[in-house]
Amino acid sequence: MRNLAALLPALFLLGSSLLPAGTALAQPLHGISMHGTPELPADFRHFPYVNPDVKKGGRISYGVVGTFDSLNPFVLKGMRTTARGVWDPEFGNLLYESLMLRSSDEPFSLYGLLAETVEWDDERSFIQFNINPRAKWSDGKPVTPDDVIFTFSLLKEKGRPPFNSRLDGVAKMEKVGDRGVRFTFNDKANRETPLILASSTPILPKHAIDPEKFEQAGLGPVVGSGPYRIKTLRPGERIIWERNPDYWGKDIPGKVGFDNYDEISVTYFLQVTTMFEAFKKGDIDIYPEGDAINGTSDTSHWGQAYNFPAVHRGDIVKDVFQPRLPTGMFGLVFNTRRATFADEKVREGLSYALDFEWLNRNILGGSFKRTQSYWQNSPLGAYGNAADERELALLGDAAKTMPAELLAGTYAMPTTDGTGADRKVLKLAVDKLKEAGYSIKNGKMSDANGRQLAFEIMTQNPAQERIALAYQRSLNLIGVAMGIRSVDDGQYQARSNSFDYDMIIRSLPSSLSPGMEQLNRWNSLSRDAQGSFNYAGVANPDIDRMIEALLQARSTEDFQAAVRAYDRLLVAGHYIIPLYYIGAQWVARWKYIDRPDMTPISGNQKQTWWDARVQ
């Protein structure tokens, strides 16, 4: 026995040496973080921004503008016309769930959901998810590693971007024991890859999905692991979700204080105006103002439209939330796939022509601030932060072509006198267009062959049209012809997917932990991938390098330098004419819908609100 005891340490070391590199000392973890460690301990009971004592029950009615004809947002056909709630960062992932949950009060930390624990090494050469033994589908069957493997394989073959590229960085995907599934990474992976697999991919039921019909994106019966199931479905009009009384995950820490309604309905409207009228009548319970994605932010509406009896009686509450996020970018996007916008000088000149001060004063209510960079109002932003040696080294020769003001952190869009005809600023626009070979001939901005500089902007609602009309007014002053094409929601989504536009108005939100989503927005490989978010059609090797740098950064200092350098490159490219940011989230609600007091980093979390009528 003494000899056996003496041999045990050696046997352990021998066994460890036979394991894959980096796995010998891997320990099951309750959570992981992109940088550092998760803030919450292994025995945490709930997220800090929820009410753990809320009584579940009642109902809520949401309203959205648009339509739906699909329950599958993971293929191109259903990408923008899937019913809300299926896979939904705003209303919650009611049907499908991910392996891990992201905390809304940390830059990028994940905690267990379908995966009870997770294992990885310091090099992040692999990640292993250990499926929660309690996890089950709505039909009672258990969630298994086979479902995970099936999901990633199916999405690689038939999914849309970015789901179809999730396995690009994976060398091997394998089942480990009864509950484990391990992903071993190749040299295409980066340090964020394991977190994206964990938090940004839905796990689908192998037994309930026919791969041959997956791309049809229809409205057939669905099986999910989430807290709700479909009660009523009226395509294009309304979907009603009801609580699954047998939901497996209601007591795990990451779900405490969530999913508080017995019933969730989502009603679809053709226009924002009709949705607001429905809110006034109590047909929907919440009305979020300031939708930058659709260009409907309007301080005058927030300040003046709430003059009706329900407000006077105190039945409606107007909340203002202060998220601690970068401003992001909302603006007019040049499609550089078009020859008209291939020259950076053309884009710069056309950017100067927008009179933001006139637009803000006369159209937007006068309360907005001009966006100057993509990560403005954060330590990651180029605006207000000079490039240091670390950042300059990353930029390399690209820094030599940047304006000195951009490197100094003082670069900003020109400020006009607000008259709508500031000659000084318009001259800047004309001079820059001259550098690109244009000049004004017979009142028209024309190239050397006499062709007028002309393009079209595509809009999807009246608010965007107002912005476009203001821009058109300014361009007319310098002889540039801009047409406005207003299309319905279906056309807008289809043409956006195929990049069939000259210019559109879009929003690109930013976080404190930018990562792989940037590949789908700005990387060269996404330029021609239909359905990607590379609306500007950018293919720039320096931008590709900087995305790779931020993805591979190990220290906070390296990460910050990479994102700032990236921000400067995007600003220098003049791919988007920046508009404005609000700096707050405005949400009106009927007072019978209540919410937690705390606002996390990411802002309001509607998934944690509740029906006060049942308390």
Swiss-Prot record:
Q: Which GO terms describe its cellular component?
A: ATP-binding cassette (ABC) transporter complex; outer membrane-bounded periplasmic space
Null allele outcome, as annotated, is:
The deletion mutant is hypersensitive to ampicillin, in a manner only partly dependent on the beta-lactamase AmpC. Deletion of the gene leads to the accumulation of peptidoglycan fragments in the extracellular milieu. The mutant displays cell swelling and lysis as well as a severe growth defect.
Segments forming a coiled coil: none
Family stated for the protein in its record: Belongs to the bacterial solute-binding protein 5 family.
Annotated InterPro entries: Peptide/Ni-bd (IPR030678), SBP_5 (IPR039424), SBP_5_dom (IPR000914)
Q: Which UniProt keywords apply?
A: Peptide transport, Periplasm, Protein transport, Signal, Transport
Gene name of the record: yepA
Task: Give the signal sequence positions.
Answer: 1-26
Name this polypeptide is given: Peptidoglycan-binding protein YepA
Species annotation: Agrobacterium fabrum (strain C58 / ATCC 33970) (Agrobacterium tumefaciens (strain C58))
| Quaternary structure note | The complex is composed of one ATP-binding protein (YejF), two transmembrane proteins (YejB and YejE) and a solute-binding protein (YepA).
